[in-house]
Each structure stands twice: as structure tokens, then as C-alpha cells.
Design a protein with these regions (language model features):
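Fe(II)/2-oxoglutarate oxygenase catalytic core
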Residues: 1-130
Length: 132
């Protein structure tokens, strides 16, 4: 008998938009108004150590500060807490990382990857729930 992998029960998706088109445009504007840089591989929210690797990733990123888009973070945290309560039950869930805004040029991409620090030079955040 073939069964679904156990981890698939941990995947939750929303089919109802969290933000209106107007709110999405405000988020886009906020991301575009922050300092933009070529995305690197192997770096974390401004921590040095990443490399520019066009074989793995071709995009531009910026970080949206909590204070500039507090309503966005409140909405995301509300959905995160509801999802956590309905499916996982972790204690003390809160958003600890700024949202990364990414733009891809024509032909841009980000190849398959995991978010971790393989050399463990920096203690990575514990991500119990990731939202895209």
C-alpha cells in the first residue's frame, strides 16, 4: 500500500487572499522603497557571509521594516497564529524576521534550496512556520 508522506500533513495553505490588491500594491511599494541589493546565497538579513551566485539565484531583495508596515505584520501574525492553533500547537509563536521583498528580472530565478547555515557560523532562527 502506498501512502502519502507524513510531512505532507504539515503543509497548510490558504486559498483566500490575505491582502486586497490595494494592500498588495502598498507592500510592493514598501519593498521597492527600501534599499535593494543583489540577492546572495548563504547570507541572512544583512549578516555578512553570502556570495553572489548567478547559478543558484538571480534576483534583487530588500527587507520591509516592522514599523513601516505594521498592519501587514499584524495581518500575517493573525493568520500565522490561527494556522498554528488549528494545525500545530506551538507555544509562543511570533514573527521574528522582517519580510523579504524579492524582485526577479526577466529570466531571474532562485533554485531549490534550504534556509540554513551549513557552516553554523551564525545561530539561525528557529523557524517553526514559514510563510510565502
Amino acid at each position: 500500500m502506498i501512502t502519502e508522506p507524513r510531512w505532507k500533513s504539515y503543509i497548510v495553505e490558504t486559498t483566500t487572499p490575505i491582502f486586497t490588491p490595494k494592500q498588495c500594491q502598498m507592500i510592493i511599494n514598501a519593498g521597492r522603497n527600501e534599499p535593494k541589493k543583489n540577492a546572495e546565497v548563504g547570507s541572512s538579513q544583512g549578516i555578512k557571509g553570502g556570495v553572489y551566485d548567478t547559478k543558484t539565484r538571480t534576483s534583487h531583495i530588500s527587507w520591509i521594516p516592522f514599523k513601516k508596515m505594521s498592519y501587514m505584520y499584524k495581518d500575517i501574525e493573525r493568520i500565522m497564529k490561527t494556522t498554528n492553533g488549528n494545525h500545530f500547537g506551538f507555544d509562543g509563536m511570533t514573527i521574528t524576521e522582517m519580510a523579504q521583498y524579492t524582485e526577479y528580472p526577466e529570466g531571474g530565478f532562485y533554485d531549490w534550496h534550504t534556509d540554513n547555515d551549513v557552516d553554523m557560523r551564525h545561530e539561525p532562527p528557529v523557524r517553526k512556520i514559514s510563510m510565502t
